Amino acid sequence: MADAKNDIVLSIRGMSKSFGRNRVLDHINLDVKRGTVMGLMGENGAGKSTMMKCLFGTYQKDEGKIFLNGKEISFSGPKDALENGIAMVHQELNQCLERNVTDNLFLGRYPTSSVGVVDEGNMKKKASELFRKLGMTVNLSQPMRNMSVSQRQMCEIAKAISYNSQVIVLDEPTSSLTVQEVDKLFEMMRMLRDQGISRCV
C-alpha cells in the first residue's frame, strides 16, 4: 500500500467550485499516478476545464484539497503553480502574437547575462535544444501571428514541457491539430511518460 501511495504524484480530494448558483464541481476526487497519461471524459459543460483551472490556480476552489507528492498545495495563481511543478496548456492560447517563437517560449522568465542583460543567445540555444529534443522543426525567429493555430498550439505544449513540470495539464490538446500533429503529440506524450512526467488531458 505504501508503494501505491508513493506512486501517486497528484491527488484531488473533495474539490468543489460554484459560479453564483451554478455548482460546476461537486466534491471531485482524482488520483494521478507518476508517469501516466489520464484522459478526462465528459460532455461540454461537465466541468473538466474548470477542474483543470482550479488545479492550475486560474480559479480558486471553494472546497477540497490538492496534494502534490503527498504534500497539500494551494496556488495563488498560475505563476505559483508553474514554480511548484504544474504546467497547463489552455484551449485558448495565451501568446504574444507580435513576438517570435523564442520570445514566447521565455515570456516572464528571460535568462540574463552576468550584467543583468537579457541573454538572447542563451534563449535561442535553449529553444533550439528543446524543439530538437521534441522532434519539432520550428523557425525560432518567426512571429507567432504568421503561424497556424496548430503550430502555435504545438509551441505552447513545448513551452509547458520546458518548465520541467511533474504534471502537465492539457485542455483539449488535439482540437486544432492535424492528423500528423496528433501523432507527433502522442509521440511527445510517450516520451514524457518514459521520463516520469504525468499528464491530464
Predicted regions and their residues:
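Glycine-rich phosphate-binding loops of nucleotide-dependent enzymes
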Residues: 2-201
